[in-house]
Amino acid sequence: MMEDKQYKGTTTIGIICDQGVVLATERRATMGNFIASRDAQKIYRITDNAAMTIAGSVGDGQRLARILQVEAKLFELRRHGSMSINALSMLLSNILAEMRYAPYYVQVLIGGLDKAGPKIYSLDPLGGRIEEEKFVSTGSGSPIAYGVLEDRYKPGMSVEEGVELAARALESAMKRDSASGNGMQFCVITAEKFEIFEREVSKQVINA
């Protein structure tokens, strides 16, 4: 039962690029076969150099995002510096592990840029944590997205190329996964900028 909730109803993507990271999601939120929202927020800014995506329970994901935002701000005030992406992912891993008997039904990507370079970590509901070296996808549309990512990913690609690849993978997932759709949202994190923006899907997806 937990596994069903864990992977239900979304597609999220993370891509390591030459100068930063790209996170991407579609906008649909579902309750079973019912489309509950067509503009769901699935990317959350944690710090000026880190963000997270959620797949699974929206409420659980929002709560975890708020916890991380507060903890990261407290760290900044006490230590006069930002938490590393590794530290953020370890903190979230510990939070999830402590709740393993009443778990958050959510799968999370944490991505960003720090002194160690661009980093993306994926975390499961029980606190399992993996550092991704190239790209990652979560949610019900991820098996379809992975086909595009594996075929077209190139080491050292720019964030602009990463956005285009993520868009292509999301659109492929939307064509086949009924729980994914209704537009795309992207987060680009580099040393120069933190940007969250939206993009409409192509006509081919709308007419599919």
UniProtKB/Swiss-Prot annotation:
GO terms for cellular component: cytoplasm; proteasome core complex, beta-subunit complex. GO terms for biological process: proteasomal protein catabolic process. Keywords: Autocatalytic cleavage, Cytoplasm, Hydrolase, Protease, Proteasome, Threonine protease, Zymogen. InterPro entries: Ntn_hydrolases_N (IPR029055), Pept_T1A_Psome_bsu_arc (IPR019983), Pept_T1A_subB (IPR000243), Proteasome_bsu_CS (IPR016050), Proteasome_sua/b (IPR001353), Proteasome_suB-type (IPR023333). Residues 1-9 form a propeptide. It is found in: Cytoplasm. Its main location: cytoplasm. It is an enzyme of class 3 (hydrolase). One of its GO terms (molecular function) is threonine-type endopeptidase activity. Its EC number is 3.4.25.1. It comes from the Archaea. The active site is at 10 (nucleophile). It catalyses: Cleavage of peptide bonds with very broad specificity. Disulfide bonds: none annotated. The formation of the proteasomal ATPase PAN-20S proteasome complex, via the docking of the C-termini of PAN into the intersubunit pockets in the alpha-rings, triggers opening of the gate for substrate entry. Interconversion between the open-gate and close-gate conformations leads to a dynamic regulation of the 20S proteasome proteolysis activity. Component of the proteasome core, a large protease complex with broad specificity involved in protein degradation. Belongs to the peptidase T1B family. HAMAP family: Proteasome_B_A. The 20S proteasome core is composed of 14 alpha and 14 beta subunits that assemble into four stacked heptameric rings, resulting in a barrel-shaped structure. The two inner rings, each composed of seven catalytic beta subunits, are sandwiched by two outer rings, each composed of seven alpha subunits. The catalytic chamber with the active sites is on the inside of the barrel. Has a gated structure, the ends of the cylinder being occluded by the N-termini of the alpha-subunits. Is capped at one or both ends by the proteasome regulatory ATPase, PAN. This is Proteasome subunit beta. It comes from Methanocella arvoryzae (strain DSM 22066 / NBRC 105507 / MRE50). The gene is psmB.
